[in-house]
Amino acid sequence: MARRNFKVLYVSGEVSPFVRFSALADFMASFPQAVEEEGFEARIMMPKYGTINDRKFRLHDVLRLSDIEVHLKEKTDLLHVKVTALPSSKIQTYFLYNEKYFKRNGLFTDMHSGNDTKVNTEKIIFFNVGVLETLQRLGWKPDIIHCHDWHASLIPLLLRTVYASNEFFKDIKTVLTIHNIYRQGILPFKIFQKLLPEEVCSGLHRQNDEVNMLYTGVEHVDLLTTTSKQYADTIRLDGEETYGLGRILEERKENLHGILNGIDTRQWNPATDKLIKKRYSIERLDGKADNKKALQEEAGLSVDAERPLVGVIAGFDEFQGADLLARSLEKLVALDMQLVICGSGDKVYEKTFRDFAEQYPEQVSLQIEYTDAFMHLAIAGMDILLMPGRIESCGMMQLFAMSYGTIPVVYAGGGIIETIHELQEGIGSGFIFHEYTDDSLVGKLSEALAMYSDEERWPQLVHEAMSKDFAWKSSAEEYDQLYRQLLEP
């Protein structure tokens, strides 16, 4: 095939820095840029949530993308589109907005979240159909629509049914990346029946009276990827780690590929990072202490250069380990350390963490709403990053952390272990606990804290972590190959 610049549209429910709940947002902040550097033209579409500040991110209206009619079976809603460039790039990012669906601040949720499932189901249908209607109005035809997680999983089915006879969409291929198999988008079937034609509804994967969005996407997409080879193997097993998708993923294993995450080293580099207190490098680490002091001050903790500072940056749900963290708190506060917890999500966990922060104000800090700048400072200022997630597809935070000399302590679930050289005989880049229990977590963290006090071995560990190359280059090349194979006639 003659090499040409193909076009790829990325569709996601979250993109950093506009909105962030999970590592998906960090992935979307850098991966499209890496793909562009391989010779593709990349663009992004996402919802315009009420939390997204137009002025801060320089969003502007596009006259020809206003009042787009989105025809659903029982009604027609209007879609308005705003656009800006992904920061530090020229990648056009389109924000799909309808006041009824997106003025509310919440991200997409499903029946297991306890939120208004009727509105959320209508919102997800509107968004998926709206992406395709926006492409038609825009007149920009991608060669590939690359969907991410359950939020965009209806698009492959729509292309195979109601849009199949539309010449504009002819020959468009679809890719679905599974970042989080725990969140599958379980929604009431009756809402789909009200809004979508029978040819679409008959292709939905139903479980009694519920639709599984992610399963539907897996069934109808052309190509499947996830963010590590280990995770690709894990989710094909028909066990509890697959949450019901193991069998269909095993059936589609020839179309399932695991490719490791990377990071944008232009955005995440302590030697050039403009968002941290003081820049530093593997050759000159003294600046890390300044960032620790700044983080302690900003988080409201007592300033103590000697006391180890441990951080957690994760959404508050069981997939990301909020349950394990909550069970471990009593033992964690008994350790000689400080703890910064950054995240949001389940209100029960938020209350648990807030209560501990109020009970131990000089030792525990909770940051529910935080900026991109604070996250950079946290990564630079922490001594240790604790990742209690049950099964990480790959993770991004540990990659950021190691690049900044912050040592990860992680659970051995999923593909995260592909990125960390477990400490053995004094050599490694992080710590891994192998049982999903509070004793295992606290025990491994205690090992890390003990090494932190070793003035000879800890700097060696930091040096090993910072020496690793996590740039997107090799992973982007793998995607380049997959994309081109998919598009071969």
UniProtKB/Swiss-Prot annotation:
Transmembrane segments annotated in the record for this chain: none
Pathway as given in its UniProt record: Glycan biosynthesis; glycogen biosynthesis
GO molecular function: alpha-1,4-glucan glucosyltransferase (ADP-glucose donor) activity; alpha-1,4-glucan glucosyltransferase (UDP-glucose donor) activity
Documented EC number(s): 2.4.1.21
Biological process terms in GO annotation: glycogen biosynthetic process
Domain of life of the native organism: Bacteria
Catalytic activity, reaction form: [(1->4)-alpha-D-glucosyl](n) + ADP-alpha-D-glucose = [(1->4)-alpha-D-glucosyl](n+1) + ADP + H(+)
Cross-referenced Pfam families: Glyco_transf_5, Glycos_transf_1
Positions with a binding annotation for ADP-alpha-D-glucose: 20
The protein's enzyme class: transferase
InterPro entries xref list: Glyco_trans_1 (IPR001296), GS/SS (IPR011835), Starch_synth_cat_dom (IPR013534)
Keywords attached to this entry: Glycogen biosynthesis, Glycosyltransferase, Transferase
Protein function: Synthesizes alpha-1,4-glucan chains using ADP-glucose.
HAMAP family in UniProt: Glycogen_synth
Similarity remark: Belongs to the glycosyltransferase 1 family. Bacterial/plant glycogen synthase subfamily.
Protein name: Glycogen synthase
UniProt organism field: Chlorobium phaeobacteroides (strain DSM 266 / SMG 266 / 2430)
